[in-house]
């Protein structure tokens, strides 16, 4: 009879400890901006960028991801790539 009571108490303690888990955290953020202008009778994109950030702990470790994209009709490909690199380092 004593063994049964000890097993029940031990089981209750184990269930109580294992059910006390940390909360799952997930945060997502997204922003986008665009500017266009008529130049020489044509609508040109001065800049178009979007940024997405997310943080979660699905694996038990906080994981942060950052994605950014940039485009422009009036900038050179080298300038566009430079801006993309700066956005991805933020």
UniProtKB/Swiss-Prot annotation:
Residues 1-21 form the signal peptide. Keywords: Behavior, Cytoplasm, Secreted, Signal. It comes from the Eukaryota. InterPro entries: Acp26Ab (IPR008392). GO terms for biological process: mating behavior; sexual reproduction. Pfam families: Acp26Ab (PF05777). One of its GO terms (cellular component) is cytoplasm. Main cells and secondary cells of the accessory glands of 1 day old virgin males (at protein level). In 5 day old virgin males, only detected in the secondary cells (at protein level). Reappears in the main cells after mating (at protein level). First detected in adult males 3-4 hr after eclosion, levels increase reaching a peak at day 3-5 which is maintained until at least day 10 of adulthood (at protein level). In unmated male adults, levels are maintained for the first 6 days of adulthood and then gradually decrease for at least the next 8 days. No expression in females. Induction: Up-regulated in response to mating. It is found in: Secreted, Extracellular space; Cytoplasm. This protein is transferred from male to female during mating and may affect egglaying and behavior after mating. This is Accessory gland-specific peptide 26Ab. The lineage of its organism: Eukaryota, Metazoa, Ecdysozoa, Arthropoda, Hexapoda.
